Amino acid sequence: EETRPQLVFHSAAYKHVQLMDDFVSEAIQTNISGTVNIADLAAKYRVSRMVMISAANARHPENAMEYSKRVAEIYVQSSDCRLKRDKGETDMFIVRLGEVYPTNTHCLITLSEACMLTLEVGVMGDGGEVYIVGGPGDGLLDSVIGEKIKREKASVDDYEHVREEVLALVQHSYTEKKAILIGLMKKIVPIFPLSSTQ
């Protein structure tokens, strides 16, 4: 009890787009399997809040890295719904970080500002939300804190099915057949599309 964490920020990921397109199995094993491990452990040890750091383009994925981040988001969202249903103690959130200055000057968010806003997200909401920090929003997003944080409520309620699909994908990832792996990720994402925001 003394060493049980209250907050977990899961930011480990492979985010190099071309590298992940070349090594799709690594995108799956790190970005998806790693997230499954962290989410499961956060629930097991009754962490109060888990925040997964995702990618801005996971909303509409176009490459292996973005698909792997969206599949990981789906797993976190379904885990949060299961925990709510089973009266679990852990709330899970997703933060999609936009490009951070100086790598992207049209965004106008610094690294320290991105960190501060991510910490703020860690104490907001009821779980299951996707927060877009420092990235471009669209008409479907509710403004939460001025222009810097947007919220998207996207519920994925079928944990058992999601877990089965995701674990099968991770198992297939050891074959290293890129086209098959991309196809399997694309198959998972449309099954659990983004719902309308609230």
Name each region found by the language model:
Residues 1-7:
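Conserved Rossmann-fold cofactor-binding substructure of NAD(P)-dependent oxidoreductases
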Residues 74, 78-198:
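Strand-loop microenvironment adjacent to phosphate/nucleotide-handling motifs in alpha/beta enzyme folds
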Residues 10, 14-70, 74, 78-82, ...:
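Conserved Rossmann-fold NAD(P)-dependent oxidoreductase catalytic core, especially the SDR/UDP-sugar
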